[in-house]
């Protein structure tokens, strides 16, 4: 077993992410008729939230060989105009001029980055055609994550709010903003940040809140909200102070070997959840909200005592007279009420993490229906999906880049979710299928996933887990797809995605992406192959002349040594 060590941050990619992207024009041409340009920033921006987007635009245009002046040359203008929804924008292009119109700063930001794409695709020259481009997001929340921020899990368990490392350098935030990310998530717990009449203040609370406030303020300059990832209310052991002082918060039935789950039927539990979440969001009102795995990953409330395929009653359910979905509903409403009492615009994303391929119990199939209307109901997009490979049907759980989806269970949940917003958990940079690479170049798969989400009226997306969040092609594709209405063709979208980076070679590049797409969908649709097969740790496998029959180790867990040679483990569920 490896020793518990803090993560090393002297990776070359970390230093690379601190540098602003160097403007590159694939079809560089001599400057057109306008050797000069000027910016008319008429959009009202009292907090200077657009300063970073304007500076990004200036960097690209100056790299194209243009000189900024007060009045002469090409005019780039921003102005306020009523739009249909938040972040929507218009680009009105004509020879010598582009007007970016929106009703809010984030619409202007999105329009500026679209203009940069057009500038790059035009070889570092201003677009001269007459055209009006109108875009609005169908996904209002688009969450990413820093590739090198700590995961805060055993055995390393590093808390990024207690160190002095800047996990969000300006250059990285600019990349996220250009790629359409408007939220990042970091890991914490309720009792680390909040206080209530039931709990004492954590000794490091003020330190955490101070850094959290700094990060939230910095990210806001790029139109990015900070979200708190949690598994709450987290079940507690018998020796936990909260359990010993307030047993009324917890379910009455004791399950041997299991922590004590919270009881949402208790008014004290409702009060506790409201108070502690209100305190957090009153302390840092700029937060976007909470992403909470409320069921499936670790025990939280009493429904956690049941597996996702188990329809038997909860042990003490006869005392509260509530069905399992009503119990969950009460907990979610309390958390959401507390969040909004602290910050009216913040939201709760209730993540029902059900990764297993087995058919779901009826209470799990009803989660979407019972989720409160002001809470986003988020489900895994691919879990439980089916594919025909090697002549037979395969059903796999967890996350998949290579499976377009959605799984039928996700489709059913989305159709059931008529009383509130629906969210999706995707894995679109890379997944456990091939973890060592930054991303897999399959934007066609992303297109098909996002088109399905559009048709199912999905409003929120979590684009990665601890892996698969490195900036690049797939993040760029997802950000642009979030603003699609899919009235055009897939081929047109892929060409538009390629042109700012590949220019005259874009058609060939799109053909290469299509080949990658066909090939990657042949990846064995087997959870054991995804987790343990050689593509992730091949060089560390044992190749002894005589087999040791050591089990294969999970390469995503730092407390296991790589290796093993029982290769039959990876294929038994597939062939």
Residue ranges and their predicted role:
Residues 66, 181, 224, 344, ...:
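Short phosphate-binding/catalytic loops that engage adenosine nucleotides
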Residues 50-66:
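Zn2+-dependent metallopeptidase catalytic core
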Residues 1-27, 34, 40-42, 46, ...:
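Substrate-binding groove of N-acetylhexosamine-processing glycoside hydrolases
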Residues 3-12, 16-36, 44-46, 53-56, ...:
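Feature activates predominantly on carbohydrate-active enzymes
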Residues 56-61, 112-119, 471-484:
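Short, Φ-rich (hydrophobic/aromatic) sequence segments
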Residues 63-75:
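Short acidic low-complexity segments
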Residues 104, 574-575:
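Residue-level preference for non-acidic, small/hydrophobic
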Residues 58-60, 74-85:
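Short, solvent-exposed secondary-structure boundary motifs
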């Amino acid at each position: 077993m490896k020793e518990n060590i803090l993560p090393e941050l002297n990776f070359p990619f970390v230093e690379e992410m601190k540098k602003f992207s160097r403007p590159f024009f694939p079809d560089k041409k001599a400057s057109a008729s306008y050797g000069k340009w000027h910016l008319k920033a008429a959009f009202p921006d009292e907090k200077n939230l657009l300063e970073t987007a304007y500076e990004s635009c200036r960097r690209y245009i100056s790299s194209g060989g243009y000189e900024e002046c007060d009045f002469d040359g090409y005019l780039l203008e921003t102005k306020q105009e009523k739009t249909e929804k938040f972040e929507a924008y218009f680009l009105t292009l004509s020879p010598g001029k582009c007007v970016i119109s929106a009703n809010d700063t984030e619409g202007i930001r999105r329009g500026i980055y679209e203009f940069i794409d057009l500038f790059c695709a035009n070889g570092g020259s201003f677009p001269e055609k007459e055209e009006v481009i109108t875009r609005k997001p169908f996904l209002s929340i688009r969450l990413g994550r820093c590739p090198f921020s700590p995961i805060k899990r055993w055995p390393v368990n590093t808390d990024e709010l207690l160190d002095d490392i800047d996990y969000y350098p300006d250059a990285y935030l600019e990349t996220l903003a250009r790629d359409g990310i408007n939220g990042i998530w970091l890991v914490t717990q309720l009792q680390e940040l909040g206080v209530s009449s039931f709990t004492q203040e954590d000794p490091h609370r003020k330190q955490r809140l101070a850094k959290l406030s700094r990060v939230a303020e910095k990210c806001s300059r790029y139109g990015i909200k900070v979200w708190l990832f949690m598994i709450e209310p987290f079940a507690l052991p018998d020796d936990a102070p909260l359990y010993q002082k307030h047993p009324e918060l917890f379910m009455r039935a004791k399950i041997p070997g299991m922590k004590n789950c919270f009881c949402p039927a208790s008014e004290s539990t409702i009060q506790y959840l409201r108070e502690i979440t209100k305190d957090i969001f009153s302390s840092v009102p700029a937060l976007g909200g909470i992403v909470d795995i409320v069921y499936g990953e670790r025990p939280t409330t009493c429904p956690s005592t049941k597996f996702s395929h188990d329809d038997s009653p909860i042990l003490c359910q006869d005392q509260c007279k509530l069905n399992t979905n009503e119990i969950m509903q009460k907990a979610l409403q309390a958390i959401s009420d507390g969040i909004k009492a602290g910050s009216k615009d913040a939201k709760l994303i209730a993540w029902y993490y059900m990764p297993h391929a087995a058919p779901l119990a009826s209470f799990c199939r009803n989660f979407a229906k019972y989720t409160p209307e002001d809470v986003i109901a988020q489900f895994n997009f691919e879990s439980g999906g089916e594919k025909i490979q090697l002549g037979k049907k395969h059903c796999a759980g967890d996350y998949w880049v290579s499976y377009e989806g959605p799984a039928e269970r996700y489709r059913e949940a989305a159709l059931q979710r008529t009383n509130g917003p629906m969210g999706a958990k995707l894995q679109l940079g890379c997944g456990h299928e091939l973890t060592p690479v930054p991303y897999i170049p399959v934007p066609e798969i992303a297109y098909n996933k996002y088109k399905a989400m559009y048709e199912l009226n999905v409003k929120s997306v979590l684009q990665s887990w601890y892996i698969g969040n490195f900036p690049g092609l797939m993040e760029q594709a997802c950000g642009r797809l979030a603003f699609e209405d899919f009235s055009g063709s897939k081929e047109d979208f892929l060409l538009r995605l390629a042109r700012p980076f590949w220019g005259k070679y874009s058609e060939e590049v799109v053909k290469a992406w299509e080949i990658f797409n066909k090939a990657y969908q042949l990846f064995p649709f087997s959870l054991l192959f995804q987790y343990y097969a050689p593509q992730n740790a091949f060089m560390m496998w044992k190749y002894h002349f005589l087999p040791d029959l050591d089990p294969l180790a999970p390469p995503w867990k730092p407390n296991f040594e790589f290796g093993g040679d029982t290769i039959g483990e990876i294929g038994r569920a597939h062939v």
